[in-house]
Amino acid sequence: MTAEDVRWQQRLANYQRARVQLQAAVDLQSGRPLSDLEQQGLIQAFEFTHELAWNVMKDYFVYQGQSDIAGSRDATRAAFAVQLIEDGEGWMEMITSRNQSSHTYNRATAEAIMQRVTRQYAALFAKFEQRMVALQTKAAEGLGGVDG
């Protein structure tokens, strides 16, 4: 087993932990309004989870022998092409939200991003996790990757 074999799986484990934290914030928001600090935490959890998601994609492609992924857009396009993700447009919107959240702080922008996280992105993250866990299981059973 090479470092690439293990790396994507280690990154997936980190992604899973981050996604659980994001989901906890989403669940909290569904029960009551969040304080300003909690809102910031939800957005930061989204940013962190997104960063780990595209890095899982990138590391998985390296494991598959494809090392030309340069950033989140490349990773997202490649992941959609091989059905690691289903909603390519939703993931591209997620990149836009991620960029908006990290480069500006505007209450209206933050609230719009929080709505997208709770209504769309959290579910996309969960579906991606399910797909990658299934591939991890196949890899452990020696059945290969996306095509295996």
Please provide the spans of the model-predicted regions:
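Solvent-exposed interaction patches of small proteins and small membrane subunits
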Residues: 1-148
